[in-house]
A protein has these predicted regions:
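Residues located in well-ordered beta-strands
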Residues: 34, 95-97, 109-111, 135-137, ...
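Hydrophobic beta-strand-centered segment that forms part of the acyl-chain substrate-binding groove
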Residues: 76-115
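Alpha-helical membrane-targeting segments
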Residues: 1-30, 52
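Catalytic strand-loop segment that frames the active site of acyl-thioester-processing enzymes
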Residues: 30-60
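A generic structural signal for short beta-strands and their flanking turns/coil linkers
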Residues: 31, 41-43, 85, 90-94, ...
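HotDog/MaoC-like acyl-thioester-processing domains
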Residues: 1-12, 102-103, 113-159
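Short structured motifs
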Residues: 29-35, 92-98, 119-121
Length: 159
């Protein structure tokens, strides 16, 4: 089993993911983020509306939505980083559009796995940094888009 597959198997185990989040991303753990799917192509993360994620307007606080959107792209990046030589990853940009009040369970999907893998391959081959614009779209239980986040990741192979 390659390193990316081993990483995917670990984080898709609910208990191991909770331990990872408790240790490395405690706010994500407190907010109740869950990884529903992780493939080389896409990741799906959910965040519930609850006491710890609410804002004064009876919807999910925008920073909690950003955390879920970032995890959907970041967990893919972590998986692809595991697949080869060491590389660093960093968020260098974030934009968001909000189109509807976020209540209930919000599901973020980020389909940018192939672009992340390509940027990492190029960085490992050239030693130069590469950026990827990942789009993480959040939908509510009715399937309506509530937010679209554009997260710019920078990848650089370590020497």
């Amino acid at each position: 089993m390659d390193k990316a597959a081993a990483f995917r198997q670990q984080v898709l185990n609910p208990w191991k993911l909770r331990l990872f989040m408790l240790q490395k991303l405690p706010m994500a753990w407190l907010a109740g983020l869950r990884l529903r799917e992780l493939t080389p192509e896409r990741a799906v993360v959910t965040i519930p509306f609850k006491y710890l994620t609410q804002n004064p307007f009876h919807s999910i606080y925008f920073a909690c939505l950003a955390m879920a959107a970032e995890l959907a792209s970041g967990i893919q990046a972590m998986m692809h980083v595991q697949s080869g030589a060491p590389a660093s990853m960093l968020v260098v940009g974030l934009e968001a559009d909000f189109s509807k009040k976020a209540v209930g369970l919000i599901t973020f999907t980020c389909p940018n796995g192939p672009q992340i893998a390509q940027a990492l391959a190029e960085s490992r081959a050239t030693g130069e940094g590469h950026t990827v614009l990942c789009t993480s779209t959040g939908v509510d239980e009715a399937g309506d888009v509530v937010a679209v986040f554009r997260i710019t990741w920078s990848f650089r192979a370590k020497r």
